[in-house]
């Protein structure tokens, strides 16, 4: 019998299938019992949607293995979605997938490079816990599961567009993180017999049409609640926290969506101020600067390599101002 991929069973909505489970998109993704999908491990320069993707054995876009934190290492985890992942950074073309400028890096890699240069005698790791399509709902679940193992000294968190985007059902229903649901998905992931039975049962139900009313994957209240929980989890494990307001290019291309992004970001900024969490909102990477910020974006949602340089520069400045990285020297970085 042909193999049934757990990704096809875990990802059910039309919107998410288009993002990660279509034949064109699924080349870099696999099923995950907790989070529904994740990056495949050990990818080596795989072309995906104008992006050259490599991952380590832990399914992270990093060029070194990630395990328990070695003694003396300062570790920064960047929790996020396709922005933090580095979508199309650097950009590549299908006819020349390995022809790119290695200095055009996503902001986690830039932070690591600059902090290492400024502290040559220290062990420093900065890596993205970030997957295209993720929301704050998934990011919180991932952090809760792995923070005790990873022991980061700092967590940088940024989510936005996926949270506000419309789906057939909200994440709290589709991505049930209770242990009973996760165990059921684990069994599907590890047993082809169960996977085939699951697919057969769903095919019988598919004959009955269901009318869906699209809603945000994560409501504004849930969005703020998730970030508050991310901050609490990080602080409970002794990690400093920075929250980044999600980038969005302009308010002209899609006015309704831009308004949602403005609202989500405003709620988040207000809530982070209440609990005195360092919050970074980069004006040039928001719709408020839409008439002059095209040079920082690849398209409407994702900053290009110059946008990521700006993010790294602003993050380093905030780290220095707020003394967030202990005794590390924080360099100035010109975008």
Segments (PLM) and residue ranges:
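Serine-dependent acyl-ester chemistry module
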Residues: 105, 160-269, 282-294, 327-335
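Second-shell loop/turn segments in exported
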Residues: 83-101, 128-129, 213-220, 255-258, ...
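Membrane-embedded segments
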Residues: 61, 65-153
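Short, amphipathic alpha-helical "lid/cap" segments that border enzyme active or binding sites
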Residues: 136, 140, 220, 224, ...
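Loop/turn elements at helix/coil->beta-strand transitions in domains of secreted/extracellular proteins
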Residues: 73-75, 121-125, 150-155, 193, ...
